[in-house]
């Protein structure tokens, strides 16, 4: 049989192209774009995937926050397999620690979100004035998504241990936030304690004074 080098080369090139396309489709996404949704610039993600993970079980906020982050980055539900050992195994989820003062942390969160990557943030309680109960807390308001926009709900009683703190997955920022003058309250998170409010996606707005800068404040992708 006579061989045709040109035909063989074309077949090889076609096979190589098919393999590249297959690998590209199978590879996880590296980022998710920020898009404005009713006044909040929010990373794009499938809300149903986050809701399928649901709210945390006791003591596992770090693991749930990591699962939310990986789900957003990969575009598929993260089971969290291999990512828990008496606390989230950050490296198993492709996250690493970042430390700095408050200004550095806020700008890092802003830059990571702008690059399409969720940030996992370590919170401590702060004292809130003008309330009748639960004066020490990590959050005050949450926002429920409906067809007409976000509904603000006063849900004040999320508080945390002074020893361990609380982990959330930051996924959004106020549309009118000033990059030169950032505040904690500019940012919105998927809070493992309340990511699902009876099946409705809920975002929690960070409270000023809650990022635990002295104790492993951020986990970032990469």
Language-model features and meaning:
Residues 54-63, 99-102, 106, 112, ...:
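Solvent-exposed, acidic/flexible segments
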Residues 29, 167, 200-203:
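Well-ordered beta-strand positions in beta-sheet-rich domains
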Residues 104-190:
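Active-site-adjacent substructure of cysteine-protease-like catalytic cores
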Residues 173-222:
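Active-site or metal-binding loop neighborhoods of secreted/extracellular toxin and effector enzymes
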Residues 26-92, 147-160, 182-184, 197, ...:
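Active-site-adjacent structural segments surrounding the nucleophilic cysteine of cysteine proteases
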Residues 82-108, 113:
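Substrate-binding cleft of extracellular glycoside hydrolase catalytic domains
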